Amino acid sequence: MKVIYQTCCGVDVHKSFLVATIVKTTGGIEPSYQKKRFSTFNNSILEFKQWLLDNDCHDVCMESTGKYWVPVFNLLEDEINVVIANPKWVKAVKGNKDDTKDSKWIGDLFRLGLVKGSYIPCKIVRILREYTRYRYKLVSCRSSEKNRYQNALTVCNIALDSVVSDIFGKSSTSIIDYLLEQSGTSINHEEIASKILKRLKSKENAVIESVEGYQMTDSQKYRMRLVRAHMDYITAEINDVDKMIETLISSNIDFENAVQLLCTIPGVKRDSAITIISEIGTDMTHFSNSKRLCCWAGLTPGCNETGGKKKSVRITRAGVYLKPALVQCAHAAVKSDKSPYYKKKYESLVKRRGKKRAIIAIARMILTAIYQMLSTGEQWNPSDLYKIDIPAPLVEKQKAKAIKQAKNLLQREGILPPDEPLAS
């Protein structure tokens, strides 16, 4: 095999230490090895960096072990080319295995160019990514608390969620506050009616019936107050994170331009655009083409075939944060009547492939468009958009023409009898 890196280093990273092996190819067939162990404290990592520079080693490869690779990467990235590899691509043969042999194995694979590097964006994108991912977790946590709150109402024989559309709306919140303050199980109908806003006045009797005879103990009241306080706290945290994200976006002209560009796509709003930018960045040169980006995002079918038998070809589990954002945009895009491009595509796909596959296909179309837009700087304007915006009379004319052509083909093949000539 051809040697790609004459001098490189393989690193096996752990929580408290790392083992590094420098691999040098000096002209012979067998390379030479230098091995050393360092602590993961900052001073020791800087010593490791200096050791690499002293040995004229500017290419390092290590596997992405948890978050342990991040401190090492942060201190090396300014002067050294660091490649982070998925552990499945650098896995050593089981059996004769230890930390030193692992680092040597990683170095040998990297030296021959057999290691696929993971996409690590620049520092400002990584900072934005930390905020958007934390916001995603906060929203998920708040959703869990909302479910607990609704379950508590069900346990207390309160069926308010069967009447109102939003159990956390103003009317519902006022009614639940009133119930939490009561000492018994009886309610004042006039008091309940006074807390119902105009939009809900038509359902006044149903609202009163839904809370009549509720059973709420002191322990359940205490638990509901805790859950609500936690929801309010999480909401405040989300607002703070949103402010920080907006500050980062507004302070970087490339981010702001990219967000404005992505917002021209049907179904993509500002929050979704920011999430997408935080995951893939604005520089598309890291991906050779749009197919590689879609594969990295987990939106392409798998390839698992052996002996002429095809096994599971489901999409991969990649894109844990990016894929949900794109699927959310796809759901919004296929419901848009103002820009029906993806809606028409979806309606065509769903007949043949089903709803789930059709949504994933639309999400991939959106990501492909994003790749082209960020690469060229052009706004969303697909080349086949004219096919979607055809006037209705022209569509009917094309349908009639297609039916006529199909009929002529069937007649030539003898499947249909020829038309009888008109009587003169």
Can you annotate each of these PLM segments?
Residues 1-424:
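A detector of single, family-specific signature residues
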